[in-house]
Amino acid sequence: SGLIGQALLARLEARGDRVRRMVRRPVIDQSEIRWDPDKGHLDPAALVGADAVVHLAGTGIAERRWTRSQKDRILESRTRGTRLLAQSLSEVFPVGGPRVLVSGSAIGFYGDRGDEPLTESSEPGTGFLAG
């Protein structure tokens, strides 16, 4: 539902791929899979037949001050869902589950470098999101 997810969804559908979205709210049709990473809920059977899972989730990093509790929320919002997906995928892998999991979150790997141009070969930053 985020910026990257919506762009990826549009691109995949334009290419002719069938995409099912994972949502936390009640599903509206067969194009959606209900899950709740906070409660550890995901029916692994819903993943059977998929080629891949793309996980682009996490609490926004610019929404609040980075208090200790907000940092914990940011970290948990990324790790909890990924753990649930990895567990569910391991259950369905032998019976036709996805063989690929792509997971991405945050944009802080390089840290705040001001106006310095950053590339894939740039050194990692320091600090909370860079570690």
PLM segments and residue spans:
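Short amphipathic alpha-helical segments and helix-helix/interface helices
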Residues: 9-13, 44, 86
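SDR active-site strand-loop-helix element
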Residues: 22, 53-57, 101-107
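A general structural motif
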Residues: 16, 50, 96-98
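Conserved Rossmann-fold NAD(P)-dependent oxidoreductase catalytic core, especially the SDR/UDP-sugar
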Residues: 71, 83-127
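Conserved glycine-rich Rossmann-like NAD(P)H-binding loop of the short-chain dehydrogenase/reductase
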Residues: 17-24
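N-terminal Rossmann NAD(P)H-binding glycine-rich loop of SDR-like oxidoreductase domains
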Residues: 1-15
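Alpha-helical "lid/cap" subdomains adjacent to substrate-binding clefts that gate access
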Residues: 78, 127-131
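NAD(P)H-binding glycine-rich loop region in Rossmannoid oxidoreductase-like domains
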Residues: 27, 31-84
